């Protein structure tokens, strides 16, 4: 009888612990050089939306409960932003300044930190070549949304033909994001327009 009670208690605690599986994503940060005590949060995956984070002397903590992998960017200025990838039960820490930071995390966040470190060590003249290689090598990674936007879309004179080829090299899961579903047809139209022969009168 006593063994039966112990077994029942064991299974009860086992079920309880499983049901209490962590589902929140937590972002902790300490960023110097912020121009305001409020950070704008721009969500890109799985949907577009905005939020804000309140900071105290550059420190903040932000938590969400994602149903699936979620990508959002912390907007530091019109030129500087930091992409963050939220998944169930994970914690990510960010330390540094608005222009030089370190991301401590797993998966896509770890990859993004490695990419930032690589680009920081790359001479300016070789940046585009390295970014090209990263985008095509990591064709299933959400980090490419950041790279495509920063180094190709937000340029004074975008190369739409090259951008089109890079987009085509991405996996279905990346192409199906809201950002890419808007970008791809627009890029194809502009690439075709630039490739069309011009009639000279």
Identify the residue ranges that each predicted region occupies.
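N-terminal "domain-start" segment that seeds a small globular fold
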Residues: 183-201
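A non-transmembrane, solvent-exposed segment enriched in polar/low-complexity residues
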Residues: 18-138, 142
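Amphipathic alpha-helical repeat scaffolds of TPR domains
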Residues: 140-150
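Sec-dependent bacterial lipoprotein signal peptides
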Residues: 1-16
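Canonical tetratricopeptide repeat
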Residues: 109, 144-145, 180-181
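Short solvent-exposed coil/turn linkers within tandem alpha-helical repeat scaffolds
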Residues: 137, 141, 173-180
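Alpha-helical repeat scaffolds
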Residues: 126-133, 160-170, 196-201
């Amino acid at each position: 009888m006593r063994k039966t009670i112990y077994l029942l208690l064991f299974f009860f605690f086992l079920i309880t612990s499983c049901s209490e599986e962590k589902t929140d994503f937590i972002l902790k940060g300490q960023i110097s050089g912020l121009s305001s005590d409020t950070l704008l949060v721009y969500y890109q995956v799985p949907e577009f939306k905005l939020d804000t984070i309140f900071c105290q002397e550059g420190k903040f903590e932000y938590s969400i409960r994602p149903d699936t992998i979620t990508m959002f960017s912390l907007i530091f200025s019109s030129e500087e932003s930091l992409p963050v990838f939220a998944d169930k039960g994970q914690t990510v820490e960010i330390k540094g300044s608005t222009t030089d930071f370190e991301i401590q995390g797993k998966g896509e966040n770890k990859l993004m930190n490695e990419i930032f470190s690589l680009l920081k060590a790359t001479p300016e003249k070789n940046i585009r070549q390295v970014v090209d290689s990263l985008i095509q090598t990591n064709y299933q990674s959400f980090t490419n949304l950041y790279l495509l936007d920063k180094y190709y879309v937000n340029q004074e004179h975008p190369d739409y033909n090259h951008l089109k080829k890079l987009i085509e090299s991405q996996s279905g899961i990346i192409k199906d994001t809201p950002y890419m579903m808007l970008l791809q047809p627009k890029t194809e139209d502009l690439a075709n327009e630039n490739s069309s022969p011009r009639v000279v009168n």
